[in-house]
Amino acid sequence: MYSNTFYGGSSSRPGPTGFGQQQPPPPPPPPPPQQQQQQQQPQQQPFPGFSQPQQQNLQPGAFMPQATGFAGSNPMQQMQMPMQQPQPTGFPPSHQFTGFPLQNQQPPSAVTAVTQQQLSAPLPNPPHETGMTSTQIAHSFAQPATPAVPAQQHASSGSKIPNMRLSFITAQDQAKFEQLFKSAVGNNQALDGETAKDLLMRSKLPGSDLSNIWVLSDTTKSGRLLFPEFALAMYLCNLKLTGKELPSVLPERIANEVSSMVDIISFAVPDARPAPPQTNVPKFDAPLMQNASAPPAPQQPQPQQPSNTQLLSQLTSQPTGFYNQATGLQPPSIVQPQQTGFPAQNAGLRPQQTGFLSNTQPTGYNGPRPPMPPMPTGYGSGLSPSQTGLAPLNAQPTGVPGQWGFVNAPATGLPNIEALQQRLMPQPGREGGFTTQGLSGNATIPWAVTKDEKKIYDQLFRAWDGFNKGFIGGDVAIEIMGQSGLERQDLERIWTLSDPNNRGRLNMDEFAVAMHLIYRKLNGYPVPNRLPPELIPPSTRNFNDSIGTVKSLLSQDAESRKSSGAFLQPQQTGVSYLKNHSFRSGSSTPGAGRKDATVFKNNDDAIGDRREAESLMERIRRVQDDIDTDPKAAFRITDSGAERRSLRRQLQSYQDQLPELASNVRKVERSIADARLELFRLKDAKAHPSAAAAIVGTGPGGTVTESDRIKARARARMQARAAELAGRPPPSTDDDGAAARRLEEETASVKAERERNDAMTRDVEESVKEFTRSLEDSLKDVDENSTREHERRRWEEALGVEDTIRDFIYDLQRASRTARVRKDERTASSQRSVSNNRYDNVSSNGDTLPVRPSQPQSTGSPSLAGLTHQERVTSAKERAQKRIAERMAAAGLKPNSDGSGETLLERQEREKREREERRKRAEEEDAKREQERQRRIAEEQNGPPVKAATTGKKPPPPPSRKGKADGVSPAETRKLGDLKNAAREKAEHEGKERALREEQLAQEAESRRLEAEARQQEEELAREREAAQARLRALEEQVRQGKIKKQEEKRRKQLAEKEAKEKEARLAIQRAELEAAQARERELQRQLEGLDEEESSDDEGPVEVTPQNSTPTQSAVLPSATTTMASPPSVPRPATPPAAPFEPELAFEVASATSTSIPSPESVKQRVAADTESRNPYFRKMGQSVDTQPPSFHTPPEQIPDPLSTTEVAPPPASAPAPPKTEIQSTNPFHRLAQQQESQKSAFAAAPLPGPLTRKSRARPEDDEWSIAESENSSDDDDDRPAGGSAKHLASILFGTMGPPRPLSAMDEKPESKSATPVQESPTVAASPPPPPPPPPPPSEPAPVTTLPPAVAAQDVEEDDDDDDENDFQDAPSMPPPPPPPPVPAPFADAPPTAPPPPPPPAFSAAAPPPPPPPPPVGGAPGGPPPPPPPAGDAPAIPKAAVPDAGAGRGALLASIQAGKGLRKVETKDRSAASVSGRVL
């Protein structure tokens, strides 16, 4: 049916399916007769030729009214058949139908009704619809409106508008236009001119504007509008109505969108062929929609029979009947000849004859003559009445499987075949991006290739095969098949099926097979796994059959020859297999009596012939040797056909890769262009954020449509209005069209650059193709025919010769190969030796080594007198390279030039000259060396120089250099009789060569040895340099380290000197303090003498002192309370020098000062001097301060009561806050001593030391919040404080970098020791210490008191001022007993475990101690009350003999303490005593 025609276009398939579907008689007009003949001839598969008379089924009734309107409306038909003009008026339609018995299936009334419909039906022919072209329609707008003539459209497939957005109108407007367009066109695809005019005239625009709008809208110039054109017209009307000017030319973007949508609609309509003749195709879909007002024209009624057989029988009979009845009214006898054309179809023709009775035909054919003119003109050219029925049957005998290329088109036609042809035709600028849209369908496609398909495919093939090569290469086929839009996998399978021989190219039949498979795939058929018989091309089938026939013939011939023995006969190829003429076998073979003309004309058995043959073979060997030894033998052309064929195959493989490379380049160019556009969009959006944010594209692919711009403008206006109302500045917005303009400019530039690159790529492709063609021409065997090739291969490759000759040829080839290999090896070695010797001659010190003459023949160049094959190839290559360089230069590319502009001939000549010069120089050097050698030999032997000259002639190297190539001259080799001379000369030549080789080998060995020695020397020098550099670096490092060490030593020396000076100053102060302390001690002893003491208390005192005696004496560490207690001047027991456990910097100084026994201050002075002289304590403190920690600070709280027990006898105890000092166990500040020595040293140096007996020093403890009055009341409060004011001050100075020590928290554990009367507790604890020591020495030894540090003396002075002995005594236990000084020079030594070291004072724990307290012997003196336990532990207990009434004094003191007398808290600077106390050295 004709539903797939564009505008009612080509209806090339009015098949039976269409007739079966349309039972009522449709009335569209017929196409011209010639075209209809072409269209209908291939349509009917069973009887293709019978479709011709189809036009005249119902013409008598259908064209009755055409008599009046036919002359004016269809002048063409009027001219064709003027003789039938008067006939239309006389034929009633009823008679016409009665004349066709086969049509009696319908009632006459129905036929008549249909006929009336046909009479009133308008013509769908475009010329009859409007009668105007596109230009006429445009001009009609400017003329007054005329009543429109309704016309009928042809496209009956329904208006199908693609789902595509037009960017120049809004979506709402597009929907409205679609609705209006569909209502106007109905089921058609296009809006005719009159209807479009009516619609456009409603806009009330002037005619000139409407004319311009029509010109701009009708882009196809077809006189009708498709939907995109109609939408464009409405858009232009809207522009004019809004007061804008119409553009003179459509913008490119709008034109592209409209044209692309027009193309989509056109491709969507199958078989779109918008040609005017095709508009006459009848329309079967809506016969009732025709307008009766249209003038009638000759129409082609369709048959009403449901049977195709009846239809065909009518169709075949009527043409002949009309043809014979062309004159008009004919008697029935005229109708009889109709049967003559169809003798085999009498069954179908006989009923039709009744319709042509004499009564009906004269009346029935009076009127219908107007439809007849097309038939004689269309079929009268080459058809006879008999041919119309049977001739097509003979010409088209297919429809049978396997008959390839002669199958008629199917009944449903071949949809989209023309669209496929248009798509696949060569078109510029169609690189890719193809889809199957517009090509796919679901039609019924036969396996075999139809005639129409074959015709179209052949046209495609010829269009692509521009050079008429007869085949299409792989690159072109890829481009053609890729345009179909199919998947790559399907195309690969189709190619495999189409190219069964894997030749990489397709001939015409194979191309048709590929296109047919593509067409089937587009219509939904799968690609088969192998070709069916219907699709095997005739050329391939015939060729395969021919090959099979030849193979069978050869096999049969071989079998027959083998069975009959004829295979031994000489064949036509000239190859002889006869063995009776062989050199090695006799005449025992069956063909002994026959002669083989292809071998020799002579008899091989004859002695003369055999000797002659052997002589010839020997001559051939010698000639081959001459050829091999010739200097130019290396350039002998050894090109063979096999090599050329391999080169051609390689060239073909490279040529096949070219399309893929070009395609990849184009793809990369497209991707680069897209990437550049995308990058520009991003950059533009970043540079103009307002424009980017304002418009958001809603069109296809995110494009910005006109509606988007309108919305953006409205939104911008609203924002500006809102900003104005709010008083804000209006937002800055970019021009709406600026972004689009920038994008268009960038797109244009990118497109231009891409086009330039594409042109460059095409130029490169053309250059490569031209180069390929030149190489192919050079590789072709132009000057060799088959005979010469056969002869050459026969004697060079030993094909078709006897075994003896074949073995001889193989021997010659092996000898040639061996000689060539040897020559190549010698050439390479000689070139190396020449280069090495030349280097040695230049670099050696005068003694040159003999150089073996080079072989010029190894580097000779071929003569170019006659260009050989290789030279032709080289010349072609140079020409192609030159052309490529020129094209690249024209394209702006810089070719990679080697810098040498010389041609091949010039380069060869230059190389030849250089070789000659090198050879001459080498010969001259050889001659000089030989003369020098002969001269030295002559001088050594003292012989005449003539002898040297004679000896010099013996091995002349220069002649050997020339003679190497000419030693065995070709003339001598050609003389067969001079074999001995040739052999002798050859032996001499070989001897010379051996001598030269030996000499060269010796030279090479010597040169290698020299090179090895040179390399070894260089390596040794390099190693020595590296060693020297390493030594230099080591020395530099040593010097640097020595400088650093010297600086450190100098710094240490300066520090030691400074410390020594400071120590001397401190010692002087300490001596003054000791003197003051001694005076204080004497005064206290006098006080103690006056006191009444109980004996028990006197006894207890020494008991407590004894265990402390065992501990190493650290009298300097005893608190000041002990000094108050030691009022009797009794001499204490000799005790070990006290060690101050607290002050890290002053520890060793105090230790040195108090290292001697406490009794004698002189010894203390001597020891201090010895310490200062012997060593610098800071060096030892660095290494040992961390390790040596005084155990006194870690004494458990249980040991605290021990001093309390001794304090019963001692003077009043110190203030209550002292006990917490003794209780600090875990906070030993000496743990961090090593890290804080420097800071403590500076702090101690800055801290002021109290004077020995000044009141100022005694008043300082009270200033430090240790008042005497509140000793008892503030004992608990003192636990919370780290120490007295001076302790805090020192701690802040000495331990500023450290956190507050833990003793603050640990002091809470000793509240009982702070009690005002610790004497009662002390006896209980005193039981634990060891028994009392022996009686103290006489009181005449108060020396130990003098050993107390000045700080202790100051504290004693303070105690005297306060007169509160009990408080003083209580303070004694608070004093930390300094640990015994270790023998090591460390500032603190561990005390022996036997003596419980008294707890350290809180000042120790809290901060650095003040200056060292007075020595502990005062507290331990027996004359007075017993000193507190810490001093007893630090110093030896003073014997009771020291004080005459020591026991009584102690008892009185104890009684007063028991009576409740409060002990004054004496601010004994035990901390300073501990800090000053040093280790015993």
From Swiss-Prot:
Extent of Acidic residues compositional bias: 1090-1102, 1262-1280, 1356-1369
Biased segments, Basic and acidic residues type: 751-766, 869-886, 904-939, 972-1065, 1077-1086, 1164-1174
GO BP terms, alphabetized: endocytosis; endosomal transport
Region spans: Disordered: 1-134, 271-386, 722-766, 816-1065, 1077-1445, 1458-1481
Annotated ranges, domain EF-hand: 205-240, 486-521
Subcellular location: Cell membrane; Endosome membrane; Cytoplasm, Cytoskeleton, Actin patch
Coiled coil: 601-784, 900-1097
Record has Chloroplast as a keyword: no
Domain of life: Eukaryota
Membrane topology: Peripheral membrane protein
Residue ranges annotated for the EH domain, each copy included: 173-261, 453-542
A molecular-function term among this protein's GO annotations: actin binding
Record's protein name: Actin cytoskeleton-regulatory complex protein PAN1
Organism per entry: Ajellomyces capsulatus (strain NAm1 / WU24)
Protein's gene: PAN1
